[in-house]
From Swiss-Prot:
Its main location: nucleus. Residues 9-24 have a biased composition (Pro residues). This is Nicotinamide/nicotinic acid mononucleotide adenylyltransferase 2. NCBIfam families: nicotinate (nicotinamide) nucleotide adenylyltransferase. GO terms for biological process: NAD biosynthetic process. It catalyses: beta-nicotinamide D-ribonucleotide + ATP + H(+) = diphosphate + NAD(+); nicotinate beta-D-ribonucleotide + ATP + H(+) = deamido-NAD(+) + diphosphate. The lineage of its organism: Eukaryota, Fungi, Dikarya, Ascomycota, Saccharomycotina. The gene is NMA2. It comes from Saccharomyces cerevisiae (strain ATCC 204508 / S288c).
C-alpha cells in the first residue's frame, strides 16, 4: 500500500533505519526467484570452450534419465490438473484423509468444458462449514489456515503463497480475478505450486477517503471468498493494528505465521519445506515504488528481494519499461512476475463507490453477497470523495 497514506508519513531518508525493522533475512525461506534464469544470467560465457569428456558424461546421464521416465502414452489434459486446496477444518486432519487417492480423483473432476477445478469453486449460496470468522479485536485474532494446502501435490514444485494488501473498499471481481490470473501464470511459467491465497485489508489508520470501517471491509472480503473460492482466505491482522503497517512488515507477519510458527508446508516425502510468500499488486503499486521519497529503499529490497512481487498490468500500462528504468526493481527483476491481462478488467473500487452514491447499479461488478452486505449496512451512500481522487484512482 502507498506509504504516503500513513498518518505519520515522512519522506524516507537515505540509509534511514525504519522502525520496526524488517525481519532478518535468515528467517525467510530461500526458494529462489520466481522467474527462471536464462543463459545471459549465468557467469560463464555461452561460447566458451568446453570439456568433451564432461559433455559426453552429461549427455549420457540425460539420455538415461529420459529413457527411465519415458511415457507409453500422451496423458489427457484433465490428468494434468492437480487440486490446489481442500477446505479442511483444522491443521490436525489425518494424513490418510488429506492424501487419499479417491479424494484426490474426486477433486480433479472437471466442471463441464471449463478449465476450472471443483476444488477452486465454493458453493455460490451456502457459506462453507467450519469457516472461522476473523476477529474484530487483536486479542481474539487467529491466523486463518482452513484453506491452506497441508501437503504439496507435485514433488517437483516448491510451495508459494500469494498475499494481496489493499483497502478493498469494497472488494470487486477484479480483486478476485487478480488471484486467478496469478495462479494461471504461476502454474504455467514457474516451478512453484500455489498452496493458498490471502487478502490483507489495511487498518483504519490508512488515510484515504472512502474507506469503510475495517471490520466491514474484512467481512466483505470474507463473503466474497466464502461464496466464490475454496483456496482464498482473509487475514485481519493488518486491519487490527493500531497504526499503519508497512507492506514489508505485513509480509513478515505471513512468514512468521506460516514458516516460523508452522514450519512451512509438508512435502510429498513427509518433510516440512519453507513457503515462498509473494505480494500480489496492480501496476499502479509498482509505479508508486518508483516514485522518489515514497518507499524506503530498505523496504523495497526486503519486499522484492526476500519475498517477490506478482504484478497485474492495467490497461495502457507498460510495467516492463518501468522495471528497466528503476535500479532497485531491475536488480530484483527475477523475483517479479508480470501478469498480462488477456481480458482487460479495470473495475475500480473508487468508481463502484461513486456508482453507489449516485444510486446506479453495481450488479456484476461485485459478488452478490457483497452487494447485499453494502445494502444492509448502508455503506458508501453518504460519503464524499475529492473529484481528483475519483478521476485519478486506479484502485
Amino acid at each position: 500500500m502507498d506509504p504516503t497514506k500513513a498518518p505519520d508519513f515522512k519522506p524516507p531518508q537515505p540509509n534511514e533505519e525504519l522502525q520496526p525493522p524488517p525481519d532478518p533475512t535468515h528467517t525467510i525461506p530461500k526458494s529462489g526467484p520466481i522467474v527462471p534464469y536464462v543463459l545471459a544470467d549465468y557467469n560463464s560465457s555461452i561460447d566458451a570452450p568446453f570439456n568433451l569428456d564432461i559433455y559426453k558424461t552429461l549427455s549420457s546421464r540425460k539420455k538415461n534419465a529420459n529413457s527411465s521416465n519415458r511415457m507409453d502414452h500422451i496423458p489427457l489434459n484433465t490428468s494434468d490438473f492437480q487440486p490446489l486446496s481442500r477446505d479442511v477444518s483444522s491443521e490436525e486432519e489425518s494424513e490418510g484423509q488429506s492424501n487419499g487417492i479417491d479424494a484426490t480423483l474426486q477433486d480433479v473432476t472437471m466442471t463441464g468444458n471449463l478449465g476450472v477445478l471443483k476444488s477452486q469453486i465454493a458453493d455460490l449460496e451456502e457459506v462453507p462449514h467450519t469457516i472461522v470468522r476473523q476477529a474484530r479485536t487483536i486479542e481474539d485474532y487467529e491466523f486463518p489456515v482452513h484453506r491452506l494446502t497441508k501437503k504439496l501435490q507435485d514433488p517437483e514444485k516448491l510451495p508459494l503463497i500469494i498475499v494481496a494488501c489493499g483497502s478493498f473498499s469494497p472488494i470487486t471481481y477484479l480483486h478476485l480475478r487478480m488471484f486467478e490470473m496469478a495462479l494461471d501464470d504461476i502454474n504455467e511459467q514457474t516451478r512453484f505450486e500455489v498452496v493458498g491465497g490471502y487478502f490483507s485489508p489495511v487498518s483504519d489508520n490508512y488515510q484515504k477517503r472512502g474507506l469503510a470501517p475495517a471490520y466491514h471491509r474484512v467481512r466483505m472480503c470474507e463473503l466474497a471468498c466464502e461464496r466464490t473460492s475454496s483456496w482464498l482466505m482473509v487475514d485481519a491482522w493488518e486491519s487490527l493494528q493500531s497504526s499503519y503497517t508497512r507492506t514489508a512488515k505485513v509480509l513478515d507477519h505471513f512468514n512468521h505465521e506460516i514458516n516460523i510458527k508452522r514450519g512451512g508446508i509438508m512435502t510429498v516425502d513427509g518433510e516440512k519445506m519453507g513457503v515462498k510468500i509473494m505480494l500480489l499488486a496492480g501496476g499502479d503499486l509498482i509505479e508508486s515504488m518508483g516514485e522518489p521519497h515514497v518507499w524506503a529503499d530498505s523496504d523495497l529490497h526486503h519486499i522484492l528481494g526476500n519475498y517477490g512481487c506478482l504484478i497485474v498490468e492495467r490497461t495502457g500500462s507498460d510495467v516492463r519499461s518501468f522495471l528497466l528504468s528503476h535500479d532497485i526493481m531491475y536488480e530484483h527483476r527475477r523475483n517479479i512476475l508480470i501478469i498480462k491481462q488477456l481480458i482487460y478488467n479495470d473495475i475500480s473500487s473508487t468508481k463502484v463507490r461513486l456508482f453507489i452514491r449516485r444510486g446506479m447499479s453495481v450488479q456484476y461488478l461485485l459478488p452478490n453477497s457483497v452487494i447485499r452486505y453494502i445494502q444492509e449496512y448502508n455503506l458508501y451512500i453518504n460519503q464524499s470523495e475529492p473529484v481528483k481522487q475519483v478521476l485519478d484512482s486506479k484502485e
